[in-house]
Swiss-Prot record:
Originating organism: Eremothecium gossypii (strain ATCC 10895 / CBS 109.51 / FGSC 9923 / NRRL Y-1056)
Cellular localization per UniProt: Nucleus, Nucleolus
Keywords in alphabetical order: Nucleus, Ribosome biogenesis, RNA-binding
Pfam families: Ribosomal_L30
GO terms classed as biological process: maturation of LSU-rRNA from tricistronic rRNA transcript (SSU-rRNA, 5.8S rRNA, LSU-rRNA)
Name under which the protein is recorded: Ribosome biogenesis protein RLP7
One GO cellular component, as annotated: cytosolic large ribosomal subunit
Family matches, as InterPro entries: Ribo_uL30_ferredoxin-like_sf, Ribosomal_uL30, Ribosomal_uL30_CS, Ribosomal_uL30_euk_arc, Ribosomal_uL30_ferredoxin-like
Keyword check for Ion transport: no
Amino acid sequence: MATLNSNPEILLRKRRNAERTRVEKQEAARRRAEAEVRQRRARQHKFVRAEALVASTLATEREKTRIQRVSKRAAKQRAGHVTGGEWLVRVRAAADGGLEREKTAYDGRATLLFVVRVRGPAAAKIPRKAHRVLTLLRLAEVNTGVFVRLTAEVFPLLQVVAPYVVVGRPSLASIRALVQKRARVVHQRAGEAAPVEMVLNDNGVVEERLGDEGVICVEDIIHEIATMGEAFAKCNFFLLPFKLGREVSGFSALSRLQKLKQREEASQTRPVSNAAAAPLVEVDVDELIGRLN
């Protein structure tokens, strides 16, 4: 005797719709992958003007020369042949609409910085040494940020990648806003086959991963980062780099105008210097986080 299908009609309809949705998503992903391959091939065969090649070559050579000067001075400083030369320039908006600059010597004390990756000099390719430093800082993508403890050893590294980053001293409110809104981690839950990237909104995950360090909740992570406590490195590397929003996006005429204004402001705030002892420029990172968070 044949067995009747006892599944309700609604359940069968849901299964059918779920299967159709899954197939449609797979087809859309396949079309996106094919489109990316076509775009990649088109970029490889794209016509490049001679002026663009010359500009890119000159800009890249200037960057290589700058990094060689910075690295050579750092080596002399480690050997004791050169002293001093580590300067910080704090740039703030003035009341009259201009910029105030305050230049101070770095005293070697540990200082908490928030470092944001930005686009480098126009037309220049990133030299290999600068790329290695950016990878070490986990700043492989533009508009990502990490917390860094500035020390005498880290200062030369930030000088190497100065055109590609924006640095500043974050306040406790900015640290809390970043961690609560943008914190992501890689974690493997019980029963999962592999670790997955997830938003950090569970204190149980924090206690499981950092409980041995005395860190059991998100507020403990914020405290360790703000005070640069003993578990600062563990908490910092537990968090993935913060993915920030774009201040200007799109390709409309207004967006292009805003990008030009943004580039002009960046050139005034953070002028690129090819000097070996160029100071490290600090900006109002709290205001920057408020715009991008």
